[in-house]
Amino acid sequence: MSEYIEREELRIDDPEYNILVENDDYLVYKKYETVRLYMKKQKQLVWCIGDFYGDAEGAIITEDNQWCIMYGCGIIAYRLKEPFDDYSYDTVCEQWSEFRRGPKDILWVEKVVQTSPTSMLVISEDESKYTLDILDNHLKLERI
């Protein structure tokens, strides 16, 4: 659910908030374990694009502005296009994809870096490296 809101009303200077990534079009921030998206041009806030056990570690917006990749306890890749649905656990949809977030396969991610228009380097807590590929809008995570 998105809501019209002026950026000044976000109160992002509040210590409860933490900006994860910002560009000309979007501001992505966390409040506790919830990640939120503010669409600057539309002045709309999406209440929840991700939820992380232990807080999100970080986020990137892809160079083409098509995806927000959030990470920490696993990865959530959120597609930056209508209808901007609110994230919910264990939901299969086109708005987002989840990777390595289940209790039996958690990957603690320290950093994600975009290495090409369709590929990200994922570095885990134990310094293992993975690739996250976005090909034809399909996402795949593989250890390298």
Give the role of each language-model region.
Residues 110-133:
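Amphipathic alpha-helical binding modules
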